[in-house]
Amino acid sequence: MKNNPLLIFIGCCLVPLILAYLALKLEWIPSASSNKGEFLKQEIKLQDWKKTEHKQWTIALNHPAQCQQACAQQLQALENLYIALGKNQGKVDVAILGQTQQKELPWRQLPEVDVLQPASLYLIDHMGLVVLQYPYHSEPQQNRLTQKGLLKDLKKLLNYSRSS
């Protein structure tokens, strides 16, 4: 009877540890993530990024020279995304990676990055690290869903990093 409280105490300490161990080993915990974009498989840091001042996040469109129709659609989507940011426009830059045929774009143009997919949108942090990819889909509805996902991810990131 004297050892009963001690056994209860030890049991209360050990049972959660055993359950946590079993949950990890038997994969009872789902491995879901809340981001809509795809993390890149390799780290890509843009060269010459530090030479100019950048805002917290940059939405970038990879626009190689051979990309025409898909990139033109994505340019229009990029403009709509920037408008949809609303009050957060001051915290986000927009950039084009490569050369466009439109000369009057209000966004920064940076050198093309060969390892990135053509016509895809990317989120780049203020240090020049490409963080998330949002691939281009030829089906307009799927493309709109991808762009909405980018907007959700960006708003989450801006909310998490409340500096400036």
Which functions belong to the PLM regions below?
Residues P64-A70, Q102, S138-E139:
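Short acidic, S/G/P-rich loop/turn micro-motifs used as interaction or catalytic elements
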Residues L78, A119-H137:
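A short, hydrophobic beta-strand/beta-hairpin element that forms part of a small beta-sheet core
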Residues Q42-W57:
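A short beta-strand-turn-helix
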Residues V131, P135-S164:
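Thiol-/selenol-based redox modules, centered on thioredoxin-like
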Residues K2-E27:
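Hydrophobic membrane-insertion alpha-helices, especially the h-region
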Residues E53-Q68, L78:
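Short active-site neighborhood of thiol/selenol oxidoreductases, capturing the structured segment around
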Residues L75-S120:
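Structured, soluble extracytoplasmic/luminal domains of envelope-associated proteins
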Residues E27-L46:
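Alpha-helical transmembrane signal-anchor/signal-peptide segments
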